[in-house]
């Protein structure tokens, strides 16, 4: 059985950057679960089809492959909008839950898998050998998101970013299905006062103690 590393946490906590580095270091396959709904939505949008069409969206979700996640248009606004439409369809959510579990159980490289998201350790892969909950203060996360936006040339105000972050935290933490909470057996990694290298070293230490 391959090793599964589940990484959860709120927005801008650094979990995506950390997950990619860990996968590269360990020779594991990486799944950015945030892209899978975008990939399904864009499969339809590219073909001129409506992502809100239940039957079409469910079929696209069932046919999703890891190669679809390499598409270069998954970060554009249209992809986010398409993702929002398909994500509201229960059949799509069920198919993509199966996709994530298959990827984790039988990763393409065969050695192991790193998945990051909101509910990997609690819902998608509760059997994961290593579970990390990566977090940081909401103020620090807002600072990081503001910097990301500015580096992309997008104008943003700290107060607005902070308010949006708090609203998203509230929504993620209190939703009825798969709320954002650490798994009972997850190691919590607070990156508020850590740079990327320090967070990476801390995560490697946790993984080493669990394997």
UniProtKB/Swiss-Prot annotation:
It comes from the Bacteria. Signal peptide: none annotated. It holds the Pfam family Cytidylate_kin. One of its GO terms (cellular component) is cytoplasm. ATP binds at residues 9-17. Coiled coil: none annotated. Keywords: ATP-binding, Cytoplasm, Kinase, Nucleotide-binding, Transferase. This is Cytidylate kinase. Its EC number is 2.7.4.25.
């Amino acid at each position: 059985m391959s090793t599964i590393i589940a990484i959860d946490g709120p927005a801008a906590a650094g979990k995506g950057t950390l997950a990619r580095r860990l996968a590269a270091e360990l020779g594991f396959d990486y799944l950015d679960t945030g892209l899978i709904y975008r990939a399904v939505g864009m499969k339809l949008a590219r073909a001129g089809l409506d992502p809100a069409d239940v039957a079409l969206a469910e079929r696209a979700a069932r046919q999703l492959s890891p190669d679809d996640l390499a598409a270069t248009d998954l970060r554009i606004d249209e992809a986010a909008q398409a993702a929002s439409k398909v994500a509201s369809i229960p059949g799509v959510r069920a198919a993509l839950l199966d996709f994530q579990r298959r990827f984790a159980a039988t990763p393409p490289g065969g050695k192991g898998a790193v998945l990051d998201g909101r509910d990997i350790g609690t819902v998608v892969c509760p059997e994961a050998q290593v579970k990390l909950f990566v977090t940081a203060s909401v103020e620090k996360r807002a600072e990081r998101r503001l910097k990301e936006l500015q580096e992309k040339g997008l104008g943003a105000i700290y107060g607005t970013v902070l308010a949006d972050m708090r609203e998203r935290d509230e929504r993620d933490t209190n939703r009825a299905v798969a709320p954002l909470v650490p798994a009972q057996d997850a190691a919590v990694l607070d990156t508020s006062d850590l740079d990327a290298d320090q967070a990476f070293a801390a995560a490697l230490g946790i993984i080493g103690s669990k394997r």
